[in-house]
Amino acid sequence: MTRSRASVALVVGGAGVVLILLALFRLVSPGRVREASTHSLLDTESFRHYFVQFADDEKAMLGKSDPLPWNWFVQNSPWLDVPDKELAEIYYFRWYSFQKHVKQTPSGFVIDEFLDDVPWAGKRNTISAAAGHHIREARWLRNPQYAEQYTNFWFSPEGEPRRYSFWAADSVYSLFLATGNKQFAIKLLPNLQENHTQWERTHRDPNGLYWQIDDRDGMEFSIGGSGYRPTINSYMYGDAEAIARIAEMAGQADVAAEYKAKADRLRQLIETQLWNPDDHFYETVVRGGQESGVRELIGYVPWYFEVPSASHAIAWKQLFDPQGFAGTFGPTTAERRSPRFNFSNPHECLWNGPSWPFATTQTLVALANLLDERDAPSVMSGTDYLRLLNAYTRSQHIRTSDGKLIPWIDENLNPDSGEWIARNILISRHQPPPNRGRYYNHSGYADLIITGLLGLRPSATNDLVVRPLVPLGTWDYFALDGLPYHGHLLTIIYDQKGERYHRGAGLTILSDGSMIGHSDSLSATTAVLSGSHEDEQAKTLRQRSH
């Protein structure tokens, strides 16, 4: 409600007192609820203040701000209402930041990593290193063309999907899991097979393992260095599994069997060759066969693709160990007990200890997968997921010259102080471009809330599972509204007493405004979607983008 609409209530006689109170309630209620007759639960206007503040902060920090594309957010963003206002603020800040990187080009929509052109980028200033993160975020926007055209770009003549490590096929399959658009994934199957073949030709050794330079993993100056890294091998396992599943959808049983066999073989190698039984961790192995002997955060990447056996969950004990990866502002990229932790190097981008949102995102996805297992080991819990997510949320800030703490995302940071390391080094050198890392798009956030904390586990079928990781007794309520999924718009509500959203007490799932699932408590809830369809707004947006 705008100020002028509230003023109207002040001059109404008779029932004016009621109208005044109603108007004031709507002005101050941050996540106010629409009437039950509408499909949308939350009133988007009640969240506009976040975006206005982001634009104001941008102008104060950078001397200018872009025009606020409010309609873009209204048309595309899923809306979140939670008691944790810092988490809500960063959720909306990351959509504010993400939108800046969605670019319309003659090649269609692309999503870049840096706002300024950088010399190590490819065509359209694109970089494949974080493309997997980009696609997982963009799949939750109402306009499917952002994710689909960007995905197509990587397999066009301009795309360079192997310039950096990139879990391309897994990303395509993850996009399908959200949209339900089977034909889009099937259409890309030949490209995904060719991409996989080229990786085999250039980066697979006779022993069956894949090697990579740490810089080409987007993780330069690491302690473990180059070689058979948990990253590239997990990516290739994930891609082989995804190709097999897409081939099954396409009715190509021979292709599915071929790639399933590739995945099974690589999984065995990861489990036997990259797992260090002494350190109880997945570690880089030098191509000559020598173990690196250092635990690095990338040792959790195998869980991103659900590679590990249950017995290897012991590795997660290192996550919050003071000599492991514990950090107030996010996990370290290497274990603190290593003699080479934070070894001296003048470069601004180091993966020898600083916290990197890229890797923190991978770790949170991996942890959600671990906790989603039916027989999830007790070594980790939803409390641990929220603890890591809170540290990541805490990290996404900067203090202005006048002492104000505002939302911010940049490159790497000090896990103990929250200082943005590369930013400060570049400023001290007067190295252009200024503010290179502003709104740095190398990580995810919304997807971590949607599929991790709030627990929507995307599926290839219309069977829907919501398994929240929110610890019992932590929140009295939460709502995720206007989430596109399999051609429907979902609303996921938890209302302990049923007094905030007035849809009943407990966990409720709505599809296009109609209840399809309910549990009386904050627990795993299942539902079945009706036949997929594309909502009218998504159809319109798709047509406009052509």
Task: Show which residues each predicted segment covers.
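Well-ordered alpha-helical scaffold segments within catalytic/enzyme domains
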Residues: 73-85, 132-142, 168-184, 234-253, ...
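Extended glycan-interaction surfaces of carbohydrate-active proteins
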Residues: 85-124, 137-157, 197-228, 268-355, ...
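The feature captures the catalytic groove of carbohydrate-active enzymes
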Residues: 38-61, 68, 158-166, 197-262, ...
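Aromatic/His-enriched, Gly/Pro-containing loop or helix-boundary segments
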Residues: 153-162, 174-178
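Acidic/polar, glycine-enriched structural segments that form the non-catalytic walls/loops
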Residues: 23-122, 177, 182-184, 189, ...
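Non-catalytic carbohydrate-binding regions of carbohydrate-active enzymes
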Residues: 168, 250-284, 314-489
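N-terminal Sec-pathway targeting helices
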Residues: 1-17
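Beta-rich accessory regions
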Residues: 13-14, 21-31, 258-261, 265-267, ...
